[in-house]
A protein has these predicted regions:
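Transmembrane helix-loop junctions in multipass membrane proteins, especially transporters and channels
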Residues: 36, 64-71, 103-109, 132-144, ...
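Hydrophobic, membrane-facing alpha-helical anchors
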Residues: 2-4, 35-41, 70, 109-115, ...
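Hydrophobic alpha-helical transmembrane segments of multi-pass membrane proteins
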Residues: 14-97, 117-134, 186-201
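Membrane-proximal helix-loop-helix units in multi-pass membrane proteins
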Residues: 89-97, 102-161
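Short aromatic-rich membrane-water interface segments that cap or initiate transmembrane helices
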Residues: 4-10, 75-87, 144-157
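Hydrophobic transmembrane alpha-helical segments in integral membrane proteins
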Residues: 2-25, 152
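Alpha-helical transmembrane segments in multipass membrane proteins, preferentially the mid-helix core
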Residues: 24-31, 94-98, 157-178
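Interfacial "cap-and-anchor" motif at the non-cytosolic start of specific transmembrane alpha-helices
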Residues: 169, 174-219
Length: 219
């Protein structure tokens, strides 16, 4: 069993995730409006924003249906929480791909590195898919349709930490190699994202990760 301190305030969840959706929609709208064509790096960055938007919506649905009893409510709870888990680790992988491409500007190199970077993502996805069959590896949904995290959630958090740490390593290692980088404060993204992940791990019901990712992407 894996449970932190539970603090669920539905109004706070709706406000934070609603703000996330608005910020991501605004970001995507502005980026598309100001560009005649999108490069691979732009598409990856937009992909992070889209995943964050979908994650915020899925989490909101998960909290709204949790504990409710109606036809299909348990299935919705399973699916929405599964999307949240996959979305979280997907952002970590996409961020590493973006950093790799931003530093070396080599699409072929990024694809080659992605073959290794995708491993934590695959582990998480396989675990989430297995969880849909009621194994309880990542989380459980009781007969009363109440969500409960289990020990497997640690895999997702560890994967994110690995992705964040690797992106920082890429930047500082490239500088040692003499790669001339323009202003690229990787910590400005990793810092808020890491803080949000830690808060959400320790205090279930505080929805901080999506909105902090949104802030990091915009600023």
């Amino acid at each position: 069993m894996m449970e932190g301190i539970t603090i669920i305030v539905l109004e706070e969840i709706l406000m934070a995730n609603g703000l996330t959706v608005l910020m991501m929609w605004f970001l995507l709208f502005c980026r598309r409006k100001n560009r005649e064509s999108l490069h691979v790096g732009d598409k990856i960055y937009d992909g992070i924003a889209i995943v964050n938007l979908v994650g915020a919506l899925s989490e909101t649905i998960a909290f709204l249906v949790d504990g409710k009893q109606f036809t299909g409510s348990r299935q919705i709870n399973y699916i929405s929480n599964s999307i949240c888990f996959i979305g979280t680790v997907s952002m970590g992988m996409l961020w590493c791909m973006y950093v790799e491409l931003r530093i070396y500007r080599n699409y072929k190199r990024m694809v080659q590195k992605a073959g290794v970077e995708i491993f934590p993502w695959l582990v998480e996805v396989i675990m989430v898919l297995c969880n849909l069959f009621g194994t309880g590896i990542m989380f459980k949904i009781s007969g009363e349709n109440v969500y409960q995290r289990t020990a497997g959630v640690l895999v997702g958090y560890i994967s994110l930490v690995i992705y964040f740490a690797y992106s920082i390593y890429l930047v500082y290692h490239s500088k040692k190699q003499g790669v001339n980088l323009n202003f690229f404060p990787v910590i400005y993204f990793v810092g808020p994202c890491f803080a949000g992940v830690v808060l959400q791990f320790l205090f279930y019901g505080i929805t901080s990760s999506w909105v902090l990712v949104a802030v990091a992407l915009i600023f």
